[in-house]
């Protein structure tokens, strides 16, 4: 089943120019893609190529200058109030900048309950139980519930944001560099959790990343973005190779997970 369909998407930002005239900076150019239920897709590209802007458009935080975005066959621009509420529940996003994604005055308990209060019909006791369950799933415990964001480490806060997104059991989870910054052990644990969610609920995942190792470990398809365009799409196999210049540059930039020991024939 197709969850998300994007056709001919273009976007630009206006900024001031000389003589008070606005100039337009193109960020996305004729982007088209589809995401199906239960699949895991990576959007790979260097910083500044338009990945995060595309993500904001996909979740409805901004409206595109041109093109169409449809959720389960319905254009986002035509969703009624009830459909838009269901859309906000079904598609969740975890941002790279976790500090800006939360209210620093609220406790973790309040942060986790917020989407459940607005998007689900759960009693307070059920919300608290699910909050505890989601914390455990991201390797945190109830001791953080009464803490506020400034009292948490960056990795802890990122996992709180992930738990908040998972609490409403979304159909599509978009992670904007949200896993790449975790250490390898935590990253592996989060990936196991996401795989479990896919099996249970058919959750689709879109990883927005520059981390090729993450793509190879978890994704089924990868789209390469460069200068606001998707320049290549590949199925992830045993040996992932790219045909585009942008893809090859990213692949060549990957460092080995562990130092490679050089063999030497010199005798001491």
Curated annotation (Swiss-Prot):
PANTHER family: D,D-DIPEPTIDE TRANSPORT ATP-BINDING PROTEIN DDPF-RELATED (PTHR43776:SF7), TRANSPORT ATP-BINDING PROTEIN (PTHR43776). It comes from Shigella sonnei (strain Ss046). GO terms for cellular component: plasma membrane. This is Nickel import ATP-binding protein NikE. It holds the Pfam family ABC_tran. It catalyses: Ni(2+)(out) + ATP + H2O = Ni(2+)(in) + ADP + phosphate + H(+). Its EC number is 7.2.2.11. It is an enzyme of class 7 (translocase). Residues 4-252 form the ABC transporter domain. Keywords: ATP-binding, Cell inner membrane, Cell membrane, Ion transport, Membrane, Nickel, Nickel transport, Nucleotide-binding, Translocase, Transport. The keyword Membrane applies. Its main location: membrane. GO terms for molecular function: ABC-type nickel transporter activity; ATP binding; ATP hydrolysis activity; nickel cation binding.
